[in-house]
């Protein structure tokens, strides 16, 4: 896959750089090891980053069936060694019933009125994030997505009716969100993001709006959503509403480095090896080579097998990056058939 180039307008001049914080979520299980990869890649790819890297950690409580905190003390120590701050937060709305909600409630772990960029933990930083010219007054989010929601039923409401019902519910202007270059009832006409990254000038304001919309949709969905599943899509349904309500929208070309040469939302290592360019693989294997990293993350079996036992390279040899299947599900099926899907 050829990655989008950020172009000459991507890098901000030093005097124009804005200091900002980064938020990821860290918790017991897979995400604690992914957090190590994120932190290590940030330090290698952008050693000049001078903001705070905050790992939001959900705390045990009535919303969690089991303790969600980072369970490996070596992971906790390594994250701190990599300059991350582990900050607790309480789960009041979601928890184990909808762990994707951590990215919403975790915003409360950030200091108020300080610009932030949220990343899903399964992301690698592959370039100088500190030089991306964010306009923190105009929030945006990742466009690296497929038409995963809504799923249109044969005799049910269409895209327009479904999305308009959501904007109407919260008193938002629907028409202004449409991409009129796309045909009516084609999914890309409607404002829809991958929630793998997003940003704004204040995490509290963003988090409160995001939480209000997400819980409102969950607890009392508009009528046209009656046949729609909101698990796991709730965050991606509420996100465009929150961004639009705060004066944001689709990201401009100045942000092309995100999901381009500056960051990679890899999601599953099998997919990374299958479709990402050589630079991403090189960054992954470089940041996982030091013994202090290796001895910790190899405890997670998929990382051990994919990175250190060569299974990832076997996946990579299966595909031509210049001629990948058009849909991700086709990639997944081929990888699973080869018994190389690990997460």
Give each language-model segment a name.
Residues 2-343:
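Glycosyltransferase catalytic domains, chiefly GT-A lineage
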């Amino acid at each position: 896959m050829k990655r989008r180039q950020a172009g000459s307008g991507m890098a901000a001049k030093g005097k124009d750089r804005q200091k900002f914080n980064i938020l990821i979520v860290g918790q017991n299980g897979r995400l604690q090891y992914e957090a190590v990869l994120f932190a290590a890649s940030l330090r290698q790819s952008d050693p000049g980053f001078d903001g705070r890297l905050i790992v939001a950690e959900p705390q045990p409580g009535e919303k969690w069936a089991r303790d969600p905190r980072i369970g490996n003390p070596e992971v906790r120590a390594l994250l701190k060694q990599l300059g991350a701050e582990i900050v607790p937060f309480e789960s009041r709305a979601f928890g184990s019933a909808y762990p994707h909600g951590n990215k919403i409630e975790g915003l409360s772990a950030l200091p108020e009125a300080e610009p932030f960029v949220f990343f899903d933990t399964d992301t690698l930083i592959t370039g100088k994030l500190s030089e991306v010219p964010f306009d923190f007054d105009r929030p945006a989010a990742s466009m690296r997505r497929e038409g995963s929601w809504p799923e249109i039923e044969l005799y049910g409401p269409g895209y327009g009716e479904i999305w308009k019902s959501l904007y109407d519910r919260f008193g938002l202007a629907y028409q202004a969100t449409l991409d009129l270059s796309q045909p009516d009832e084609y999914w890309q006409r409607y404002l829809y993001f991958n929630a793998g990254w997003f940003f704004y000038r204040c995490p509290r304001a963003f988090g409160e709006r995001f939480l209000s919309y997400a819980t409102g949709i969950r607890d009392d969905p508009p009528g046209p959503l009656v046949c729609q599943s909101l698990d796991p899509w709730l965050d991606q349904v509420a996100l465009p509403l929150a961004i639009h309500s705060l004066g944001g929208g689709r990201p401009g070309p100045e942000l092309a480095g995100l999901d381009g040469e500056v960051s990679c939302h890899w999601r599953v290592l099998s997919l990374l090896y299958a479709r990402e360019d050589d630079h991403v693989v090189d960054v992954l294997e470089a940041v996982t080579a030091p013994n202090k990293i290796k001895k910790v993350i190899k405890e997670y079996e998929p990382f051990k097998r994919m990175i250190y036992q060569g299974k990832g390279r076997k996946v990579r040899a299966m595909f031509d990056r210049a001629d990948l299947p058009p849909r991700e599900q086709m990639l997944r099926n081929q990888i699973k058939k080869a018994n190389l899907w690990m997460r």
